Amino acid sequence: SVKSRGLGDVYKRQYHDRFSGIARLYGNSGSDAIRRAHVAVIGIGGVGSWSAEALARTGVGEITLVDLDDICVSNTNRQIHALSQTVGQSKVNVMAERLHTINPECHLNAEDYFLTEKTLESVLDRPLTGVIDAIDAVRPKCLLLAECVKRGIPVVTCGAAGGRNDATLIRIEDLS
């Protein structure tokens, strides 16, 4: 006799088919941990857009995208979501739609605001596995990093040179 499979089984099979390479690389327990992960990407520009897409393509189960900016034609050379048809649209909304087509099972939160002292809590007051900081401005970057350290939330920081003009003049300093 043929058993009727529930929708959960169908999604599980689709997920397995889509991300079987991740299980081969990290094992089933690693793949399951990635599927349960919730990562926030703050700043959906040249670094954040590529980071968010990599998370979706890795099978991360929930992604929160935070940025208030719209896509500009000048973003085309460095931002994965910057296409002729997306110019003028919200970065987080366009990115969420794109990620949904890559990983339909991923829960996506598109938060249309900049990270500030007032909005920091709304981002970090959720169960996060990690944060990717792709913020250009130094002040909100420092706020985010300090709060992630305080809360014990793993954070990867990257992005532009804090709005500086010459990123080739690298100095190593404490951001505090």
Residue ranges, per PLM feature:
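E1/E1-like adenylate-forming module used to activate ubiquitin-like modifiers
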Residues: L128-S176
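Short glycine/serine/threonine-rich phosphate/pyrophosphate-binding segments
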Residues: V47-E53, V73-S74, A137-L143
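Short amphipathic alpha-helix with an adjacent loop that forms part of the alpha/beta core around
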Residues: K118-P127
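Glycine-rich adenosine-cofactor-binding loop
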Residues: R35-A56, T64-D67
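Conserved SAM-binding strand-loop segment of SAM-dependent methyltransferases
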Residues: H107-Y113
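N-terminal charged helix/coil linker that caps or initiates catalytic domains
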Residues: D9-A40
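Glycine-rich phosphate-binding loop and adjoining beta1-alpha1-beta2 segment
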Residues: L65-N103
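Single conserved hydrophobic/aromatic residue that forms the stacking wall/gate
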Residues: S1-Y11
